[in-house]
């Protein structure tokens, strides 16, 4: 324990959150206790509360971590040249890769986040999560505006409703492909990849101007 005291608080928080993540993934958040997190992480319960006041703060820490990872994936997808459709495909593939690599984080990124910071009763991680989410929205907004300017996307697109709709539809499509892959293979005679390609292209057509070849 003496060695741990010499380490920065961020190291302890990351270690505890990592252990909690494993338990959340195995048992679910609601069914995991702080006692179990303490045991899994190798900290006493008293020490655990030095770094996190409760389980919700650990969840908030992990949600922020998930949003930061998602932002990195989106940034990489959009930081490339190419047509609007190519960049859209990059977004879809980055989300798919994110879900496959970090399935638990993918689920956390879909959770409702706090947007009311007019009072003092909020966690620092919640405000930072909101900020990262807004950075993601700005990147996608710029992508849509670039597509409209290029004549590839419809001019009547309402930016924020479109962004939120696409987050919901793309994430839902990815989860459906994961959870219903046996049905998709048996009844549709499609592989998971073929189903997703069809779904991604269908969604793109809903915002395409009609001038771009898909």
Residue ranges of each PLM-predicted region?
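C-terminal peripheral helix-coil segments that are non-catalytic and often amphipathic
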Residues: 97, 138, 142-150, 164, ...
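Amphipathic, non-transmembrane alpha-helical scaffold segments
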Residues: 9, 59, 63, 67, ...
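Generic hydrophobic, amphipathic alpha-helix propensity
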Residues: 12-21, 37, 62-66, 70, ...
């Amino acid at each position: 324990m003496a060695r741990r005291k010499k380490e920065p608080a961020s190291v302890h928080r990351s270690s505890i959150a990592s252990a909690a993540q494993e338990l959340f993934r195995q048992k679910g958040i609601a069914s995991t206790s702080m006692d179990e997190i303490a045991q899994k992480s190798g900290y006493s319960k008293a020490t655990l509360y030095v770094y996190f006041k409760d389980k919700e703060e650990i969840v908030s820490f992990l949600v922020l971590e998930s949003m930061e990872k998602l932002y990195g994936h989106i940034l990489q997808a959009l930081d490339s040249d190419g047509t609007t459709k190519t960049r859209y495909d990059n977004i879809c593939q980055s989300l798919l890769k994110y879900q496959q690599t970090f399935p638990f984080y993918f689920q956390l990124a879909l959770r409702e986040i706090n947007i009311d910071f007019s009072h003092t009763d909020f966690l620092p991680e919640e405000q930072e999560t909101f900020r990262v989410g807004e950075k993601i929205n700005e990147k996608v907004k710029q992508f849509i505006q670039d597509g409209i300017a290029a004549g590839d996307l419809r001019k009547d697109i309402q930016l924020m409703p479109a962004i939120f709709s696409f987050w919901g539809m793309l994430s839902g499509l990815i989860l459906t492909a994961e959870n219903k892959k046996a049905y998709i293979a048996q009844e549709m005679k499609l592989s998971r990849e073929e189903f997703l390609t069809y779904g991604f292209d269908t969604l793109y057509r809903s915002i395409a101007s009609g001038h771009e070849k898909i």
